[in-house]
A protein has these predicted regions:
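C-terminal helical subdomain
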Residues: 99-100, 111-162
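Short, flexible catalytic-loop segment of classical short-chain dehydrogenase/reductase
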Residues: 65, 102-111
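Catalytic Tyr-X3-Lys loop
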Residues: 2, 10, 19-38, 53, ...
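Conserved NAD(P)H cofactor-binding loop of Rossmann-fold oxidoreductase domains
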Residues: 7-14
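A short, exposed helix-loop element centered on a Lys and neighboring polar residues
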Residues: 41-42, 84
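Active-site loop of short-chain dehydrogenase/reductase
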Residues: 1, 48-60, 92-95
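Active-site helix of classical SDR
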Residues: 41, 75-78
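Active-site-adjacent segment of SDR/Rossmann-fold oxidoreductases
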Residues: 66, 85-95
Length: 162
């Protein structure tokens, strides 16, 4: 396996009474959004390092300052930390692990009121697969590459190479 896109996610109920958030919101969110992608990384990264090539993209979230979604947000923040830490172990090699933030898109998870179509996020979401700058542990936000082709997004993300 050369490329892994950890894109599965679980968003728990929106809790207006967030001081009464049940523990299960956290445990379920962490199982799916943090622990599962970490285990997938732990499974595939050693083989990628052994071969000298690989790309892992972990899908994160830009949701911040919303205690109503604390379980979800905390689980994604933990995934960010794991990704950054794992990235430090392969920095400068042709094995790269990064985060991708698709933004708020009209999907089953994002709902019908989201401002962005899934198609508009594609260049920013898959960008990390095509980068070749040997930098790991960064967040690639789809909104930063909106309206670009994939080729334009790669050039914008690595201007010193072009």
């Amino acid at each position: 396996v050369d490329i892994v896109l950890n894109n599965a996610g679980l968003q728990i109920a929106y809790r207006n009474e967030y001081f009464s958030t049940p523990v299960s919101d956290y445990t379920e969110s962490f199982k799916i959004n943090t622990i599962a992608p970490a285990m997938i990384c732990y499974h595939f990264m050693p083989k990628m390092i052994e071969r000298g090539f690989g790309r892992i993209l972990n899908t994160t979230s830009g949701i911040r300052l919303e205690p109503q979604q604390a379980g979800y947000s905390a689980s994604k923040a933990a995934l960010d930390k794991i990704t950054i830490d794992l990235g430090s172990t392969v920095e400068g090699t042709d094995v790269m692990i990064n985060l991708t933030d698709p933004g708020w898109c009209r999907t089953d998870l994002g709902g019908p009121n989201a401002p962005n179509s899934p198609e508009s996020a594609i260049p920013g979401v898959v960008l990390g697969v095509f980068l070749d700058d040997k930098i790991s542990g960064r967040i690639l936000r789809a909104r930063d590459y909106g309206g670009m082709t994939l080729e334009e997004a790669v050039k914008a993300a690595t201007p010193s190479l072009y």
